[in-house]
C-alpha cells in the first residue's frame, strides 16, 4: 500500500505487546527480556515563546502553492537472510506521522517494506519531479539501522546514497529550499545509562551571494539517537522519538522554528522516557535524539 488516504487507517493497527525493541541487528549472544516502557507524566505546558523576531532575510520562503511532498518509508518485515527481527510498533509510528505531516500541509505517501533498490528508486524519482511550486521536501525513514546505514527489507544501504539525490546539483527545483530527513533507526549497539541531574572571529573571504550555493546546503537530518547508540521502540505505542516528534509537531508545528521544535523533541525523549528490564544491563536506559543541520535560514511551517 502506498499513496492513498486508506493507508492512515491501515497504519493505525498496532501490536498488543508492550515490550520495547531496538532498531538494530539482534545480539544473538544474549536476549533482551521484559523491557517495558516507563513514561513520566509530568510534562510541563507553559506558554509558547519563540524567543526571536522573524526577520524575512533569514527565513525560508513558504509562500509557494504547496508545502511539498513527504515520503514515509516504513520497513517492518525483513528477509530472513538479513537476520533482522520484525519491527512491531512501526505501523503506529507511520500512522501518527502520516496524520502529523498531513496536518502541516504536506502531501504524504507511505511505502511499506521496501527493498534497498525500491528505496533508492522512490527517492531518485522524487528528486526528478518538479518541485518548483513546493516550499520544501520531507522524508521519514523507519527501519533497522547501523551507523550511517539503513536497512531495506533485503539488506542494508548507506543513508547518504538515499539523500544524495536531493543535492543542489541534482535536484534543481529544490535548490535553496529545505530538505528534511527524519530517521528512526539504531546507529550502533551502545546503551545510555543516564546520569542523575543535580573563540575569536574568523576572517572569511566575501563572495558574491549570487555566485554559488554549496550542493550539500539546506539539508536537515533529525536522527532518533546519537551515533553508536540503540534507538528504542515500543510495539504498542511506537518509537520514543516518533512519539515525541509527533507530539511536539502537533502542539507547536505551526508556531515554532524547526530547531526549536527538535530541541523540544530532544528534551521530551531525554526526560520522559526510560526502559525497565529484569536484566540489569538493559534496565533504566535512556536515549537522546540528534540533529545535524545544514539549513541556511530559519524554517517555520506556517504559510
Curated annotation (Swiss-Prot):
Positions of region (Loop L4): 274-288
Places the protein is found: Cytoplasm, Cytosol; Nucleus; Secreted, Extracellular space
Propeptide: 1-23, 199-206
Expressing tissues: Highly expressed in heart, lung, liver and kidney. Low levels in spleen, skeletal muscle and testis. No expression in the brain.
Gene Ontology CC terms, in alphabetical order: cytoplasm; cytosol; extracellular space; fibrillar center; nucleoplasm; nucleus; plasma membrane
Gene Ontology biological-process entries: cellular response to lipopolysaccharide; cellular response to staurosporine; defense response to bacterium; execution phase of apoptosis; fibroblast apoptotic process; heart development; lymphocyte apoptotic process; neuron apoptotic process
Entry-linked SMART domains: CASc
Modification sites for Phosphothreonine: 173
Residues flagged as site, Cleavage: 36-37, 45-48
Keywords assigned: Acetylation, Allosteric enzyme, Apoptosis, Cytoplasm, Hydrolase, Nucleus, Phosphoprotein, Protease, RNA-binding, Secreted, Thiol protease, Ubl conjugation, Zymogen
InterPro entries the UniProt entry points to: Caspase-like_dom_sf (IPR029030), Caspase_cys_AS (IPR033139), Caspase_his_AS (IPR016129), Pept_C14 (IPR002398), Pept_C14_caspase (IPR011600), Pept_C14_p10 (IPR002138), Pept_C14_p20 (IPR001309), Pept_C14A (IPR015917)
Chain's role: Thiol protease involved in different programmed cell death processes, such as apoptosis, pyroptosis or granzyme-mediated programmed cell death, by proteolytically cleaving target proteins. Has a marked preference for Asp-Glu-Val-Asp (DEVD) consensus sequences, with some plasticity for alternate non-canonical sequences. Its involvement in the different programmed cell death processes is probably determined by upstream proteases that activate CASP7.
Identification of the protein by name: Caspase-7
Organism per entry: Mus musculus (Mouse)
Amino acid at each position: 500500500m502506498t499513496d492513498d488516504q486508506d493507508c492512515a487507517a491501515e497504519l493505525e493497527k498496532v501490536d498488543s505487546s508492550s515490550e520495547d525493541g531496538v532498531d538494530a541487528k539482534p545480539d544473538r549472544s544474549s536476549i533482551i527480556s521484559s523491557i517495558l516502557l516507563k513514561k513520566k507524566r509530568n510534562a510541563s505546558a507553559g506558554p509558547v515563546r519563540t524567543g526571536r523576531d522573524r526577520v524575512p532575510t533569514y527565513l525560508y520562503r513558504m509562500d509557494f502553492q504547496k508545502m511539498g511532498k513527504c515520503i514515509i518509508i516504513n520497513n517492518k518485515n525483513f528477509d530472513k537472510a538479513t537476520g533482522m527481527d520484525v519491527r512491531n510498533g512501526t505501523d503506529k509510528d507511520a500512522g501518527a506521522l502520516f496524520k502529523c505531516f498531513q496536518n502541516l500541509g504536506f502531501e504524504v505517501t507511505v511505502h511499506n517494506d521496501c527493498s534497498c533498490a525500491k528505496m533508492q528508486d522512490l527517492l531518485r524519482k522524487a528528486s526528478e519531479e518538479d518541485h518548483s511550486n513546493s516550499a520544501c521536501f520531507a522524508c521519514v525513514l523507519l527501519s533497522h539501522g547501523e551507523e550511517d546505514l539503513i536497512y531495506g527489507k533485503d539488506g542494508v544501504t548507506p543513508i547518504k546514497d538515499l539523500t544524495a539525490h536531493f543535492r543542489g546539483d541534482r535536484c534543481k527545483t529544490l535548490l535553496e529550499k529545505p530538505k528534511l530527513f527524519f530517521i528512526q533507526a539504531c546507529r550502533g549497539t551502545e546503551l545510555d545509562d543516564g546520569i542523575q541531574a543535580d573563540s575569536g572571529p574568523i576572517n572569511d573571504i566575501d563572495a558574491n551571494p549570487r555566485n554559488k550555493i554549496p550542493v550539500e546546503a539546506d539539508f536537515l537530518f533529525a536522527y532518533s539517537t546519537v551515533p553508536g547508540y540503540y534507538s528504542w521502540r515500543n510495539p504498542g505505542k511506537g518509537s520514543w522519538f516518533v512519539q515525541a516528534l509527533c507530539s511536539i509537531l502537533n502542539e507547536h508545528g505551526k508556531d515554532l522554528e524547526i530547531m526549536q521544535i527538535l530541541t523540544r523533541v530532544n528534551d521530551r525523549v531525554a526526560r520522559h522516557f526510560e526502559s525497565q528490564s529484569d536484566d540489569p544491563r538493559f534496565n533504566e536506559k535512556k536515549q537522546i535524539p540528534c540533529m545535524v543541520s545544514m539549513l541556511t535560514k530559519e524554517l517555520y511551517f506556517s504559510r
